[in-house]
Curated annotation (Swiss-Prot):
Self-association and partners: Part of a stable entry-fusion complex (EFC) which is at least composed of proteins A16, A21, A28, G3, G9, H2, J5, and L5. Formation of the viral membrane is necessary for the assembly of the complex.
Membrane topology: Single-pass membrane protein
Cellular localization per UniProt: Virion membrane
Identification of the protein by name: Protein J5 homolog
TM spans (from-to): 115-135
Organism expressing this protein natively: Fowlpox virus (strain NVSL)
Length: 137
């Protein structure tokens, strides 16, 4: 019974204060929900306001959050450069261990063949040809 009363208080407070940082887990921005759909991962599993200790989270949402199969980590990138198609990331983190991974971008070598006849004229020509065949038949 306490959970119901507590949940009602949470919803009441967050309806009155939807922009409060502690209520953003209940009222996320549409872009956050869209990112969750694109990731195929509910926003409450990774969205920072849902991880806050002071977040106002109702019982049902808290139960759903327990099912999140996700390891949460924060990555902070320092300097990022793109030079001659090579992405260089300098990450000065707390650890002294770094793994170098070189990436390069190579444009596709492909030939583009333009159609001899514009497709709209091709369709028109086929329609006229079908009409001529129909008349002569």
């Amino acid at each position: 019974m306490d959970n119901v009363i507590n949940d009602e208080a949470i919803f009441k407070y967050c309806e009155s204060n939807p922009k409060d940082r502690d209520c953003l887990c209940i009222h996320p921005e549409p872009t956050i929900e869209k990112i969750g759909e694109d990731l195929l991962l509910p926003y409450y599993c990774w969205y920072e306001p849902c991880k806050r200790k002071t977040a106002k989270i109702p019982t049902a949402l808290r139960d759903n959050m327990k099912r999140c199969n996700l390891i949460d980590c924060s990555v902070s990138l320092g300097e990022i450069n793109l030079l001659d198609g090579i992405l260089k990331v300098n990450n000065d983190c707390l650890s002294s261990h770094a793994i170098y991974a070189g990436y390069s971008v190579k444009p596709l070598e492909q030939e583009i063949h333009l159609p001899i006849i514009d497709p709209k004229y091709l369709i028109l020509g086929l329609a006229i040809l079908a009409l001529i065949v129909l008349i002569n038949w």
